[in-house]
A protein has these predicted regions:
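Charged active-site motifs of nucleotide-sugar-dependent glycosyltransferases
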Residues: 5-6, 38, 113, 150-152
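Extended active-site neighborhood of metal-dependent phosphoesterases/phosphodiesterases
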Residues: 55-150
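N-terminal active-site segment of His-dependent metallophosphoesterases
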Residues: 1-63
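Active-site neighborhood of phospho(di)ester-bond hydrolases with catalytic His/Asp-centered motifs
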Residues: 10-11, 38-44, 68-75, 118, ...
Protein backbone atom coordinates (compact mmCIF):
# COMPACT_ATOMS: atom_id res chain seq x y z
CA UNK A 1 0.00 0.00 0.00
CA UNK A 2 1.27 3.43 -0.88
CA UNK A 3 1.54 6.09 1.81
CA UNK A 4 -0.81 8.32 -0.10
CA UNK A 5 -3.99 7.99 -2.12
CA UNK A 6 -5.18 10.90 -4.23
CA UNK A 7 -8.94 10.95 -4.76
CA UNK A 8 -10.80 13.31 -7.06
CA UNK A 9 -14.39 13.41 -5.80
CA UNK A 10 -17.06 15.11 -7.86
CA UNK A 11 -20.80 15.02 -8.38
CA UNK A 12 -23.69 16.85 -9.98
CA UNK A 13 -22.64 17.09 -13.61
CA UNK A 14 -26.35 17.64 -14.29
CA UNK A 15 -25.91 16.84 -18.01
CA UNK A 16 -28.94 18.35 -19.70
CA UNK A 17 -30.17 21.81 -18.77
CA UNK A 18 -28.35 23.58 -16.94
CA UNK A 19 -25.19 21.59 -17.86
CA UNK A 20 -22.09 23.71 -18.50
CA UNK A 21 -19.57 22.05 -20.85
CA UNK A 22 -16.84 24.42 -19.69
CA UNK A 23 -17.23 23.08 -16.14
CA UNK A 24 -16.67 19.53 -17.41
CA UNK A 25 -13.62 20.67 -19.37
CA UNK A 26 -12.21 22.33 -16.24
CA UNK A 27 -12.83 19.14 -14.25
CA UNK A 28 -10.96 17.03 -16.80
CA UNK A 29 -8.09 19.53 -16.80
CA UNK A 30 -7.98 19.32 -13.01
CA UNK A 31 -7.80 15.53 -13.25
CA UNK A 32 -4.82 15.84 -15.59
CA UNK A 33 -3.13 18.30 -13.25
CA UNK A 34 -3.53 16.35 -10.00
CA UNK A 35 -3.37 12.85 -11.56
CA UNK A 36 -5.62 11.15 -8.98
CA UNK A 37 -5.33 7.46 -8.18
CA UNK A 38 -9.11 7.18 -8.38
CA UNK A 39 -12.04 9.37 -9.41
CA UNK A 40 -15.30 9.16 -7.46
CA UNK A 41 -18.51 10.51 -9.01
CA UNK A 42 -21.31 10.47 -6.47
CA UNK A 43 -24.47 10.98 -8.43
CA UNK A 44 -26.56 13.39 -10.42
CA UNK A 45 -24.69 12.85 -13.64
CA UNK A 46 -27.88 13.87 -15.45
CA UNK A 47 -30.66 16.37 -14.94
CA UNK A 48 -33.61 14.19 -16.00
CA UNK A 49 -32.12 10.70 -16.58
CA UNK A 50 -32.49 10.95 -20.36
CA UNK A 51 -30.40 8.78 -22.67
CA UNK A 52 -28.77 11.76 -24.39
CA UNK A 53 -27.78 13.14 -20.97
CA UNK A 54 -26.12 9.83 -20.10
CA UNK A 55 -24.25 9.97 -23.43
CA UNK A 56 -22.82 13.34 -22.39
CA UNK A 57 -21.98 11.97 -18.93
CA UNK A 58 -20.21 9.00 -20.54
CA UNK A 59 -18.00 11.38 -22.53
CA UNK A 60 -16.96 13.08 -19.29
CA UNK A 61 -16.24 9.76 -17.54
CA UNK A 62 -14.26 8.57 -20.56
CA UNK A 63 -12.23 11.78 -20.33
CA UNK A 64 -10.67 10.54 -17.07
CA UNK A 65 -8.74 8.00 -19.14
CA UNK A 66 -7.42 4.78 -17.64
CA UNK A 67 -7.89 5.87 -14.03
CA UNK A 68 -10.34 3.83 -11.97
CA UNK A 69 -13.68 5.65 -11.74
CA UNK A 70 -16.28 4.82 -9.08
CA UNK A 71 -19.73 6.01 -10.13
CA UNK A 72 -23.00 5.82 -8.24
CA UNK A 73 -26.38 7.23 -9.28
CA UNK A 74 -28.12 10.15 -7.63
CA UNK A 75 -31.75 11.17 -7.46
CA UNK A 76 -31.48 13.01 -10.80
CA UNK A 77 -30.30 9.80 -12.47
CA UNK A 78 -33.74 8.21 -12.25
CA UNK A 79 -36.70 9.58 -14.22
CA UNK A 80 -38.82 12.12 -12.39
CA UNK A 81 -41.80 12.75 -14.67
CA UNK A 82 -41.70 9.59 -16.81
CA UNK A 83 -43.79 7.72 -14.24
CA UNK A 84 -44.09 4.39 -16.06
CA UNK A 85 -40.34 4.20 -16.46
CA UNK A 86 -39.80 5.34 -12.88
CA UNK A 87 -42.06 2.56 -11.59
CA UNK A 88 -40.92 -0.32 -13.78
CA UNK A 89 -37.36 0.43 -14.90
CA UNK A 90 -36.00 3.40 -12.93
CA UNK A 91 -32.36 2.54 -13.63
CA UNK A 92 -32.81 1.50 -17.28
CA UNK A 93 -31.07 4.54 -18.76
CA UNK A 94 -28.47 4.37 -15.98
CA UNK A 95 -27.64 0.82 -17.07
CA UNK A 96 -27.29 1.94 -20.69
CA UNK A 97 -24.59 4.26 -19.33
CA UNK A 98 -22.99 2.11 -16.64
CA UNK A 99 -23.59 -1.38 -17.99
CA UNK A 100 -25.02 -4.22 -15.99
CA UNK A 101 -22.75 -3.79 -13.01
CA UNK A 102 -24.43 -3.68 -9.64
CA UNK A 103 -25.75 -0.43 -8.23
CA UNK A 104 -23.76 -1.05 -5.04
CA UNK A 105 -20.08 -1.67 -5.77
CA UNK A 106 -16.74 -2.44 -4.19
CA UNK A 107 -13.59 -1.10 -5.84
CA UNK A 108 -10.06 -1.88 -4.67
CA UNK A 109 -7.46 0.76 -5.49
CA UNK A 110 -3.87 0.75 -4.25
CA UNK A 111 -4.52 -0.33 -0.66
CA UNK A 112 -7.99 1.18 -0.42
CA UNK A 113 -11.44 -0.37 -0.35
CA UNK A 114 -14.08 1.92 -1.82
CA UNK A 115 -17.70 0.92 -1.25
CA UNK A 116 -20.29 2.84 -3.22
CA UNK A 117 -23.94 2.54 -2.16
CA UNK A 118 -26.85 3.63 -4.32
CA UNK A 119 -29.12 5.84 -2.21
CA UNK A 120 -31.40 6.91 -5.08
CA UNK A 121 -34.88 5.72 -4.10
CA UNK A 122 -37.10 6.06 -7.18
CA UNK A 123 -40.32 5.12 -5.38
CA UNK A 124 -39.88 7.73 -2.65
CA UNK A 125 -40.08 11.50 -2.83
CA UNK A 126 -37.36 12.47 -5.27
CA UNK A 127 -35.25 14.25 -2.65
CA UNK A 128 -35.34 11.40 -0.13
CA UNK A 129 -32.49 9.00 -0.68
CA UNK A 130 -32.28 5.83 1.34
CA UNK A 131 -29.67 3.25 2.29
CA UNK A 132 -31.22 0.07 3.66
CA UNK A 133 -29.96 -2.57 6.08
CA UNK A 134 -28.87 -4.91 3.26
CA UNK A 135 -26.66 -2.18 1.84
CA UNK A 136 -25.13 -1.48 5.24
CA UNK A 137 -24.40 -5.21 5.56
CA UNK A 138 -22.89 -5.16 2.05
CA UNK A 139 -20.52 -2.35 3.08
CA UNK A 140 -19.68 -4.00 6.40
CA UNK A 141 -18.82 -7.29 4.71
CA UNK A 142 -16.65 -5.55 2.11
CA UNK A 143 -14.74 -3.71 4.80
CA UNK A 144 -14.41 -6.73 7.11
CA UNK A 145 -13.09 -9.04 4.39
CA UNK A 146 -10.62 -6.50 3.00
CA UNK A 147 -6.98 -6.10 3.93
CA UNK A 148 -6.61 -5.14 7.58
CA UNK A 149 -4.54 -2.03 6.89
CA UNK A 150 -6.54 -0.87 3.87
CA UNK A 151 -8.02 2.59 3.78
CA UNK A 152 -11.82 2.35 3.78
CA UNK A 153 -13.97 4.84 1.89
CA UNK A 154 -17.77 4.81 1.77
CA UNK A 155 -19.59 6.74 -0.96
Amino acid sequence: MSDRLTVLHTSDFQCGKPYLPEAAEALLELAEDIDPDVVIVSGDLTQRAKKREFVTARSIIDGFGARPVVVTPGNHDVPLYRFWERLFDPFGNWRSFAGERALDTVTMVDGAIIVSLNSAAPLRAIVNGRVDDCQVDFARQAFETGERDALRLLV
